Amino acid sequence: MNKISVFKLFLILIVFFTSISCSTNTKKVEYKERSVDEIYNSAMNLLDSKKYKKSSEEFEEVERLHPYSIWATRAQLMSAYVQYKLNDYGASITAANRYIELHPGANDIDYAYYLIALCYYEQINDFRRDQSNTSFALDSFNNLIRRFPGSEYTRDSKLKLGLVKDHLAAREMNVGRTYQDLDNYIAAINRFKIVVDSYSQTSHLPEALARLTELYFMLGLYNEAKVYASVLGHNYPNNKWYIYSYSLFNSKKNNLLSNSKNDKAENIESIDNSDSSIFLKTLDDFIKLFEVEEP
């Protein structure tokens, strides 16, 4: 046998054993036909087991194989929910919006709106960072409350809406304080006014009123200062910001226009609310502090 024949035989043997090996290791995947309710129930069971990825695949299978069934409609909304559980908020919002477009009259359409709001809510950043998602959450919760005032999700939406507004108010207060530190009083006033006008139900209102009172007094605009002092004293007579404002103006009313950093509202934490006997606490006494002769 010549060398060429031996080489050919060797190649034939390699191909033969390779084919045997492949056929042995290859497992035949059998397709098992399932009804639509079987697939949907499988998806729900996986969801209950917190196997969200596999559950998502099963819901997609329902829509792919049975696109015109009632199960497909349900699967579309459940897919949006599963994406929310996977923290894929962008995909969840897209799926929920698609559901709203395809089924605007569905009985559970309010949940799709609620889910969109939740997705934005979960993405809210620290108030010192970009607040785009906070604004989207605000609009989305308001949209749900306006469209579905009797929805079972409205109560929770209102609670979360309050937290969203408080977060946005914190952002405005932070920017306003920064402007005040830089002695840019007009810019600071504009920020604090946003809190008073748009977020009056938040915990930041007393501070905003106190800072507006202080800033207007420092600018010599005593009538404007009186307005905000009146609101502060009437609504928050025992609040530390009222006590701070009174003590500040009572001790510094003749030289508030100095730019001393020690007179700014950052000293609020040093005030003890329990030891307020040193202050005249009536609103009339407070307003009298503003009876400064106009230049």
Across the structure, where does each feature detected by a protein language model lie?
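Acidic, polar-rich low-complexity tracts and alpha-helical solenoid repeat scaffolds
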Residues: 2-6, 18-295
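Hydrophobic helical h-region of N-terminal Sec-dependent signal peptides
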Residues: 9-16
